[in-house]
Regions:
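Pocket-lining segment of extracytoplasmic ligand-binding domains
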Residues: 53-138
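Short, glycine-/small- and polar/acidic-enriched structural segments
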Residues: 1-57, 63, 73-77, 90-96
Length: 138
């Protein structure tokens, strides 16, 4: 299992489980996979009418900083920001994994999609072979 996203609260938060986020503001990057992952984690723990979210920036580092500034009480992060947050004393109140799917429209050329998957696979191989070379991108 690959942890894709984590619902994170700052070190000073009194939230320890996702149920405690009922009615509290969670910053999500609407329209992106991490936002859907966040909704999945929240809706599994909180009544739908108690899920409270706001639009947050797409870049996870900026979202993390906004959470620490108090713009919202929790947000969803992915690696390497999950590790950064944990090292700073933040808590993961929920995690979810990557289901192994990509979203594409019905008009997407299958050959183009196959090329995309080959590119992702090659990128993963290169990063895993020399992580220090690519760490600055995170």
């Amino acid at each position: 299992m690959i942890v894709c996203a984590a619902l994170v609260v700052p070190p000073h938060s009194n939230v320890y489980v996702p149920q405690e986020l009922a009615g509290r503001m969670v910053g999500l990057d609407y329209g992106n996979g991490t936002a859907y992952a966040g909704l999945q984690m929240l809706e599994g723990a909180v009544r739908r009418d108690e899920v409270t979210t706001c639009a947050a920036v797409i870049h996870p580092g900026e979202r993390y900083a906004a959470m620490l500034r108090g713009a919202f009480e929790a947000t969803v992060l992915q690696e390497p920001w999950i590790t950064v947050a944990e090292k700073a004393g933040c808590r993961l109140v929920s995690t979810t994994f990557f289901h192994g799917t990509w979203v594409a429209g019905p008009d997407l050329d299958p050959a183009l999609y196959a090329a995309f998957l080959r590119g992702v696979t090659q990128a993963v191989r290169r990063i895993n072979a020399d992580k220090r070379r690519y760490v600055s991108y995170f």
